[in-house]
């Protein structure tokens, strides 16, 4: 893996298809302020915006969350399936069926047994994507800070769909053409925590020097757990994962 990997190569469709990708619905913790006030009104626990990704290794380089300005979103009161903590989360209305069991809708939040089964949930508020724009959230992994612009806020983008995921796109400008375009439009900075060999940079703490994909290791040297899996476990422990597959 001595050859340089351009972000173009890293983003080629099918580059990673031989291995089973780990996907995660990540929870980004909303900061309370004037813009987010309506999300905190009668909230249940902390408030999160949920974003799905099949490239967890790009999450430390997250700089923004992109929503569809005209898409319908809802606020859901529920529990984290891993930590069992109460939480309020934002997802696209049309994606509720992908993440919540219909039979548990409007079940009693007070009677939840905290066993990860039959997690109750309740829709409590509906709004358009453009109403979320400008809301700020806590940095997920504060290994390093973005450069060259603003960061950690919700922006609007025309490429967001509800065909899969949560209707919210985790946006890492260094690792995607759409991400870079929409970030520039909104004055969002960049954060690149992967070197040209495909390894995490020294800022990445316990992950520094690890290849972002096990396929990049020399034959026989790949660890049992890829960094995607390690990051997903860390997110579960932090209470920042809603679904890992």
Whereabouts are the PLM-identified features?
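Non-cofactor substrate-recognition interfaces
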Residues: 37-49, 56-245
